[in-house]
Swiss-Prot record:
Name used for this protein in its record: Protein BIG1
Transmembrane segments: 282-302
Taxonomic source organism: Kluyveromyces lactis (strain ATCC 8585 / CBS 2359 / DSM 70799 / NBRC 1267 / NRRL Y-1140 / WM37) (Yeast)
Family recorded in the similarity comment: Belongs to the BIG1 family.
Known glycosylation sites: 145
Lumenal side: 24-281
GO BP: (1->6)-beta-D-glucan biosynthetic process; cell wall organization; fungal-type cell wall biogenesis
Length: 323
């Protein structure tokens, strides 16, 4: 029985050693929150939770603080299952539409380690809060199938959109008919651009994250991936200004009419202009001389060619007198 007892102990020890390794493969999910309009007081959370484990309750507090300002006309909740921090670096080019939306937003924060509770759909809680807090009646669920298109809306009513993409393939995996992880991220990025392009106005607030923890290769668990540091470590992002307030600033008073060509300093040329006469005296004299000579020649030609009265008339007159 001793060998069997030792074997059982070895199994227990092996299981205890294996458990941390398996847990190391479970990633806290990354998340992006960005808004077209300025949301005062949100940027402070970036410094407070940057690179720190963010409990789900704290994340919900930040999200509701952003939502409660009710300054957007569309609230978009994007769920990308399987998203990891490494995707923002390794597949940045496949997410360049999302990158541009974040870059041009007035308010944007990122959380790299959101510790969500598995199988807890926090989007439903946030959507319910949004609709209640901002008095929104319309909610649209989009399956996230990039081959499908939904009917765009043109009414200027505040809405909530939820986009649920299918899970991403694992790193290095190729799925028939879908492609690699890079291919799927790029297709989803284009679909997100399509969805955002159907919005009646650009005044949106977007939540982009994975609602489930993903597994990554062991080689990635020890690596540090910052989400687009060129954006989020830029000191100008610490300043709370509305980067998209151009319309309000560029529509004040009416601009007075101004011709394309400014003729205010134009000078009108005349033959009596002294400067013109001084600069072109020789040419003017030559033109006048040629003109006078031409006139004289024409008068002389007329005089030379003038026909004399016919003598035959005089003879007829004399004959009449004789008779």
């Amino acid at each position: 029985m001793q060998p069997s007892f030792m074997t059982m102990n070895e199994l227990i020890v092996f299981a205890l050693l294996l458990t941390p390794l398996l847990a190391a493969r479970q990633q806290s999910v990354p998340g992006l929150l960005f808004s077209y309009n300025l949301a005062p007081g949100i940027v402070k959370y970036q410094d407070k939770y940057d690179n720190a484990q963010l409990p789900q309750d704290d994340f919900l507090k930040v999200a509701k603080d952003l939502i409660s300002q009710c300054h957007s006309e569309t609230y978009v909740f994007v769920n990308q299952p399987g998203l990891s921090r490494s995707d923002f670096k390794q597949h940045k080019q496949s997410m360049h539409k999302l990158y541009n939306y974040v870059l041009t937003s007035s308010t944007t924060v990122k959380f790299e380690k959101i510790d969500i509770v598995q199988n807890d759909d926090i989007y439903e809680e946030l959507i319910a809060y949004t609709m209640d807090k901002c008095n929104i009646d319309d909610k649209i669920d989009i399956g996230g199938n990039v081959t499908d298109r939904y009917q765009p809306f043109v009414e200027a009513r505040t809405r909530v959109l939820r986009v649920d993409f299918p899970p991403l393939p694992q790193q290095g995996q190729y799925v028939e008919g879908i492609g690699t992880r890079k291919d799927v991220l790029q297709a989803n990025d284009e679909y997100l651009r399509y969805v955002m392009g159907t919005l009646p106005t650009p005044k949106h607030t977007v939540f982009y994250m994975s609602l489930e923890k993903s597994e990554v290769p062991d080689t990635e668990t020890s690596l540090s991936y910052d989400i687009w540091p060129e954006i989020f470590t830029n000191p100008q992002r610490k300043v709370e200004i509305d980067r998209n307030d151009r319309v309000a600033k560029e529509m004040p008073k009416l601009v007075p009419y101004r011709p394309r060509i400014d003729t205010e300093d134009d000078k009108y040329l005349t033959v009596l202009d002294q400067e013109f006469i001084d600069n072109h005296y020789g040419i003017i004299v030559l033109i006048i001389g040629v003109t006078i000579a031409f006139i004289l020649l024409q008068l002389g030609a007329v005089k030379v060619k003038k026909p004399s009265k016919p003598q035959i008339t005089k003879d007829v007159t004399k004959e009449k007198k004789t008779q």
